[in-house]
Swiss-Prot record:
Biased amino acid composition, Low complexity: 64-81
Keywords in alphabetical order: Aminopeptidase, Hydrolase, Protease, Serine protease
Role of this protein: Serine protease that may function in the proteasome pathway.
Reaction it catalyzes: Release of an N-terminal tripeptide from a polypeptide
Record-annotated active site: 126 (charge relay system), 353 (charge relay system), 539 (charge relay system)
Enzyme nomenclature, EC number: 3.4.14.10
Any one GO MF annotation of this record: serine-type endopeptidase activity
Positions of transmembrane segments: none
Domain called Peptidase S8: residue spans: 102-600
Protein name per the record: Tripeptidyl-peptidase 2
Organism in which the protein naturally occurs: Oryza sativa subsp. japonica
Chain spans, region Disordered: 45-81
Length: 1359
């Protein structure tokens, strides 16, 4: 998975740029020893196979084409070569930091300096652009650079629906509870102030938060060390004064001082800064909505960050003003107000990525023009699609709102340097809406192709897989290598970065449209504390291309050339400079390297042509295949015979095209060409009208060699051949190698690698293979070498099966690998030496590579144990060679299904959530409740929706997990995460959006699974048997066997024993895990910690119904009590239980409850359970009026409970140890324990009431008397229970507090809080803050108050 498609240097700021980097771990692994960025994600490589005739590649048309060259312009212009090396001058060095020559920008601007992007508006769909960053304030002609800054995800939303009014001195109480002073100069005719608050770290990136935490902890540690020193001084002084005292009071005083010191030391160890709270205030000044922010908590200085000192902001688009939270963070933000002041969006970036992207596209540096972006005259809007709550992951909500904003602002271009893998190309809700934006609103959409190279089929969505979006690959020139990457010796020629994703798509489309420079030193946000940074990736090539297209837009607008995404795309593709003469390299580079000047010449010449694009859909004749966008033959079977394909060619006009003036007269005569007539057969001419035309293609790959082959069928306008290909049908043929031997193996000897070289092999994986063991040996080189190893297999309706490794060889050596494969599918093996690895060495790397296929086939890949005692029979075979059958099955997770307890549909406010078509987006909120009996790591899963963002017809999915205190523990989207939760009850809310209410209605009972990890000690290892009765009888254990090729071996998988099942698992839950069958061969065991074969399969066990307890009714002697007596007991207990049914909120309820109590007491005098229930109800009764009388009532009720109990008899009974076999004695003991608990609870409640009365009284004499009663009551309590436990600890805390032993009180209270058997109680934390303030630890009090907003927020945040 990736989403940000850029890489950065190995610095703290760089880490922020790539918080959830492009693909897996390659960002971290692919950093070149001397090249800052060489961080790549998934692997993909340039093709080395060369087959097929000449292609109408970029810039080289089969007929007259606009002036172009077959190779990119020399990147060495302005440099000097010495001894075969590459040297930079100072100007060319600066140029290399922001590459533009490579795409012809220098030539274009030299001819048209006024067409530098002026008049072009670009929407940046990314992580949020910093409006304070260098080069992003104005355009080259003095206009504002950034016209709007929008958080489309909602991650910065603050609920400001609470309205307050100022008091007489001009102060209000903010949402955080802080008293805020209003600036008297602020106009507010209504005098209504909307207030909200937010933890400021929720607005910051992890990198910025980490820096702030370090800075703030330094200051906090200083204060804490002072407090520790003072506490230690007090303890030492006490020890000197009372060193030999054995007095109990002196001992307790000493313990108190020791507790204070211990508490401070533990605070330092457990310090976790969750950040201060900022208060947000919004109001309407009579003209517009305004926002002010109070950041005193962040400043750390009472004189800074005050609300009244803040310069009010309004929606950014109105005044284009931004704020800075504090000097410490240097983080800028903007504000947008929605829903009549009830919602304020505080917009910050979630990564430096977007600012860097925006700088490449359009930065303007008047003092250093060489560092300008590609289109310094262009203007921008920032659409934040990366959600800060999710680390910077894009969300469906963010993507759709961004499209809405782009249309609303009438943008000319969109740049999106984000993406994900997909199982279906050109499919999904966002793809549909993006196509509408392009086709109807004429916005040019440009996106990154992905960083998953060097293997083929690695382009991601949406850039590399969507017909309406221009996907851009990443190119590195010699100048970029020498300057931006600072390599010791630049390569002689430019090349595609090793990690740049390659095509084709699963449905045969080319995947990569064009290439552009994929690295730059560009602006980054101010909070990084630097002005610019080096990043590379297709994230950088996309804005480079987008900036180049913005120049075209600027020129076309200025010269009155009709602007259309169709025309622009044809211009840039047909004039791109070829990077390689090898046809197969088109899958790597697309049509070539963008050339702005030539594209403009093309656009000028094509200005009178119809604004039309040809859409292609292809079907194989005789097969009911889905509509394809290319022909893709991948496998030995498809290459053994000739195939015929029907191509449907449909002209696509913009939606506002006139029927009579454009559609009816449209007619084009096209001559068809193929790049290799020996393989591809086509008609010679076709006539195309508005309703389209079909023609057939015959592909005969029978006689071609093994490997990769790429061909094209393209049409040329007979009347205007200079236009180049009007449409192209990409044809990719992969003919794999068939292996032999036992086991099947492929040996590649003496492969020679230099920097950037890629070797590809395509292998027909034998049926029956399930894993591969690889040996890679290197030799004959000097400096360390880094290699990317990738394998890819394509499965229908599934993301590509991909394995990858990044390996560094410090010296000649051998490495072993093993990974799973799917039998019967073609496997691509890519071995690539990283583009900058060994670049200064003249010695090639010699590589020997051996790949051996192994496999154990089973008759059922997914095993489901149904919860019964019966085992499951499995039949295993080895089809390739002898293998050792060693089954291992482990159940390590439990999945519990839940249905929503509540579902709610609501129409969202139109300010952000109305589509350009006018359709209103609707939200479905599903509420689930679940309970954990013990702490656990859990992950919510929604099988219908998870793991699909672009290839999903539902717009958005977002969940959050909270407790009864409204504390949010976790949130997530399409890729749920594990979160560690304590014991307790939790609420999960799932938020789904769409404009079709009928679709949402179908999801109202959507099943969600809570997946819980088992602790390692609780993993369940299943047993195997050679007999069907083995699990029951306990014999016939199966351990291992040798499989002879073709001969089946059967065994049974037994269910887990009842004793091994996890506790507190609900029936209907499913234990899940994995099972493996084979073992890797001995040569690779040294490298593999786990010697089991890497091919694993799913296994599950359904939790059966609970055991029926037949012992419940045993021991009930019919002769002990008569039926009449038992009936009386039942009636009595029901009446007592009924007491809890009164809420006592109304006078009628109170009088009814009192009457019931009055009737029950005489009927059941001295019956302790009744009196205990009465006490419980009185304690729970609301007391807003007379608190003193209420406490007196509690004391009276508690005394009645105490008086009802014979304490001597109780003590005697509890001291006796009953006979464990005497059932009656055991029941009596349990009854006595219940009575003891009722006594203790009465004493506890009485003590709390006495303390409360004491706090309400002011008369000293009564206070002294109350102290005696309190102490007497407390001493009675500790006779029966440990008063320091969680249940009774509050009274101990009050007692220690009354005695002035605040340290001891704090210790007891902290122990209560840390007991995770219950969820946090606000009253305990409030008491904790009171104790800390009484001690005088200001810094600890401030810390705890900040945590209160985390544990007990006033409300759940908006979605």
């Amino acid at each position: 998975m990736w989403h940000l498609r850029g890489r950065s240097s190995v610095t703290a700021a760089a880490a922020a740029a790539l918080h959830k980097p492009v693909a897996h771990l390659r960002l971290l692994l692919a950093v070149s020893a001397w090249s800052v960025p060489a961080a790549a994600s998934n692997v993909a490589a340039a093709s080395t196979t060369t087959r097929g005739g000449p292609s109408p590649s970029a810039g080289v048309a089969p007929r007259a084409m606009p002036s172009s060259s077959s190779s990119p312009p020399s990147a060495a212009e302005g440099t000097t070569a010495a001894a075969g090396g590459f040297r930079l001058t100072e100007p060319s060095f600066l140029e290399s930091l922001m590459p533009k020559k490579e795409i012809g920008v220098d030539r274009f601007l030299a001819a048209h300096p006024e067409y530098d992007g002026r008049g072009a508006l670009i929407a940046i769909f990314d992580s949020g652009v910093d409006p304070a960053a260098a080069g992003l304030q104005t355009t080259s002609d003095g206009k504002p650079k950034i016209l709007d800054v929008i958080d489309c995800t909602g991650s910065g939303d603050v609920d400001t629906s609470k309205v307050v009014k100022a008091d007489d001195d001009g102060s209000i109480v903010g949402a955080s509870g802080t008293h805020l002073t209003i600036n008297p100069s602020w106009k507010n005719p209504s005098q209504e102030w909307h207030v909200g608050c937010k933890l400021v770290y929720e607005l910051f990136t992890d990198t910025l938060t980490s820096r702030l935490k370090k800075e703030r902890k330094k200051k906090w540690d200083e204060h804490n060390q002072e407090a520790i020193s003072e506490a230690l001084k007090q303890l030492n002084e006490f020890e000197k004064k009372h060193s030999k005292s054995d007095d109990a009071k002196q001992k307790m005083a000493r313990e108190d001082l020791q507790s204070r010191l211990e508490y401070l030391r533990k605070q330092a160890e457990g310090y976790d800064d969750r950040g201060p709270v900022i208060d947000i205030v919004a109001w309407h000044d009579g003209d517009v909505w305004r926002v002010a922010v109070d950041t005193q908590g962040l400043e750390g200085n009472k004189n800074c960050g005050k609300l009244a000192d803040f310069v009010p902001l309004t929606n950014y688009r109105l005044e284009r003003k931004f704020g800075i939270f504090s000097k410490l963070d240097a983080c800028s933000f903007v504000a947008n107000i929605y829903d009549d002041g009830n919602l304020v969006s505080i917009v910050t970036d979630c990564s430096p990525h977007a600012t860097h992207v925006a700088g490449i596209a359009a930065a303007f540096h008047p003092d250093e023009p060489l560092l300008n972006g590609v289109a310094p005259g262009a203007q921008l809007i920032s659409c934040k699609i990366g959600d800060t709550r999710l680390g910077s992951m894009e969300t469906g909500t963010g993507l759709v709102r961004a499209l809405i904003a782009a249309v609303e602002h009438k943008c000319d271009l969109i740049n999106m340097s984000y993406g994900e893998p997909t199982l279906l190309p050109d499919y999904g809700r966002f793809i549909d809406l993006a196509s509408e934006v392009v086709d109807k609103h004429r916005i040019i959409f440009i996106s990154s192709a992905g960083n998953n190279g060097p293997a083929l089929n690695t382009v991601g969505a949406p850039g590399g897989t969507s017909s309406s979006i221009i996907g851009v690959g990443a190119y590195v020139s010699p100048a970029m290598a020498a300057g931006a990457h600072c390599v010791v010796q630049a390569p002689a020629e430019g090349m595609e970065y090793t990690w740049s994703s390659r095509g084709p798509t699963a449905d045969g489309d080319l995947g990569v449209s064009i290439s552009a420079p994929g690295g730059a030193v560009a602006p980054v946000p101010t909070w990084t504390l630097q002005s610019r940074m080096l990043m590379n990736g297709t994230s950088m090539s996309s804005p480079s291309a987008c900036g180049g297209v913005a120049l075209l837009v600027s020129a076309m607008k200025a010269e009155g050339i009709p602007l259309s995404p169709y025309t622009v795309r044809k211009a840039i593709e047909n004039t791109a400079a070829s990077i390689s003469d090898v046809p197969e390299e088109k899958l790597t580079t697309g049509h070539g390297l963008l050339q702005v000047d030539r594209a403009f010449e093309y656009a000028q010449q094509a200005k009178e042509l119809p604004l039309v694009s040809y859409r292609i859909s292809i079907n194989q004749v005789g097969k009911p295949t889905s509509k394809l966008r290319g022909i893709y033959l991948r496998g030995s079977n498809t290459c053994r015979q000739t195939s015929e394909w029907t191509v449907q060619l449909d002209p696509k006009f913009h939606e506002d095209a006139s029927n009579m003036e454009q559609l009816v007269p449209f007619e084009e005569c096209l001559q068809l060409h193929s790049t290799d007539s020996s393989v591809i057969k086509i008609p010679e001419y076709i006539m195309v009208t508005n309703n389209g035309r079909t023609f057939n293609i015959v592909v005969n790959p029978v006689n071609i060699s093994s490997g990769l082959h790429y061909y094209e069928v393209y049409g040329i306008d007979c009347k205007a051949p200079w236009r180049g290909p009007i449409f192209r049908v990409p044809i990719t043929v992969i003919k794999p190698i068939a292996l032999s031997g036992e086991p099947p193996a492929l040996t590649l000897s003496n492969l020679s690698f230099k920097s950037g070289h890629i070797e590809r092999r395509f292998i027909n994986v034998p049926i029956g293979a399930s894993w591969v063991e690889v040996t890679m040996r290197t030799s004959a080189f000097d400096t360390p070498r880094r290699f990317f190893l990738d394998t890819v297999q394509i499965c229908p309706l599934k993301r590509p099966i991909k394995w990858e490794a990044v390996v560094t060889f410090s010296s000649p050596s051998l490495k072993n690998f093993s990974f799973p494969v799917e039998g019967g599918l073609t496997l691509e093996l890519s071995i690539a030496q990283f583009w900058s690895s060994g670049i200064a060495s003249h010695e090639p790397t010699c590589v020997d590579f051996e790949i051996v296929f192994h496999g154990i086939s089973v008759d059922q890949k997914i095993i489901g144990l149904d919860g019964s005692e019966a085992p499951v029979r499995v039949v295993a075979r080895s089809l390739l060679a002898s293998e050792r059958l060693v089954p291992v099955a482990t159940l390590n997770k439990v999945k519990t299904p839940y249905r929503p307890v509540e579902s709610n549909l609501c129409s969202l406010p139109p300010s952000r959530d109305r589509l350009p078509s006018g359709k209103q987006i609707i939200a479905l909120t599903l509420t689930y409740k679940f309970k954990l009996e013990d702490g656990a790591e859990i992950k919510p899963r929604v099988p219908l929706l998870n793991n699909r963002i672009y290839d999903n017809k539902f717009e958005s999915q977002y969940y959050r997990i909270s407790d009864s205190n409204k504390c949010v523990y976790s949130s997530g989207d399409v890729y749920p995460n594990y979160v560690k939760l304590s014991k307790g009850e939790y609420t999960l809310q799932l938020y789904i959006r769409h404009d079709n209410v009928q679709l949402l209605e179908k999801l109202k009972q959507l099943v969600l699974f809570i997946e819980r990890k088992l602790e390692k000690k609780d993993f369940i290892q299943l047993s195997f048997y050679s007999e069907p009765d083995g699990p029951t009888v306990g014999n016939g254990t199966f351990k291992s066997s040798i499989l002879v090729p073709g001969e089946p071996e059967a065994f049974y998988v037994g269910p887990p024993s009842r004793e091994k099942l996890p506790k507190n698992v609900l029936p209907g839950s499913v234990l899940v895990g994995s099972i493996t069958y084979g073992a890797v061969s001995s040569f690779s065991k040294k490298d593999d910690q786990n010697q089991h074969a890497p091919a694993s399969y799913s296994i599950s066990y359904l939790i059966p119904p609970s055991k029926v307890d037949n012992d419940k009714e045993k021991g009930v002697s019919s002769g002990r009590k008569s039926i009449s007596e038992r009936l009386d007991d039942e009636v009595r207990d029901t009446k007592i239980k009924f007491l809890s049914g009164f809420n006592q909120e109304t006078e009628d309820d109170k009088s009814s409850w009192t009457a019931l109590v009055a009737s029950l007491k005489p009927e059941y005098p001295k019956y302790t359970p009744l009196l205990a229930k009465i006490l419980e109800c009185i304690v729970q009764k609301a007391t807003s009026d007379d608190k003193f009388s209420h406490q007196k009532e509690i004391i009276a009720a508690a005394d009645e409970v105490v008086d009802s109990i014979d304490k001597e008899d109780l003590a005697k009974s509890l001291s006796l140890k009953p006979d464990p076999e005497d059932e009656e004695a055991q029941k009596n003991k349990k009854k006595m324990e219940e009575t003891r608990d009722q006594l203790a609870d009465a004493l506890y409640q009485k003590g709390l009431a006495l303390a409360e009365i004491e706090s309400l009284k002011t008369d000293e004499s009564t206070e002294a008397s109350a102290k005696d009663v309190f102490e007497e009551n407390y001493k009675e309590l500790i006779k029966w229970v440990d008063a320091k436990t969680t249940k009774y600890g509050s009274l101990t805390v009050l007692r220690e507090r009354r005695c002035g032993r605040l340290g001891t009180a704090l210790k007891v209270l902290n122990d209560m809080i840390q007991d995770d058997s219950e969820q946090p109680k606000k009253r305990l934390y409030d008491l904790k803050i009171q104790l800390i303030e009484e001690i005088g630890w200001v810094h600890v009090s401030a810390y705890e108050k900040q945590w209160m907003h985390v544990r007990f927020p006033p409300s759940l945040p908006p979605f």
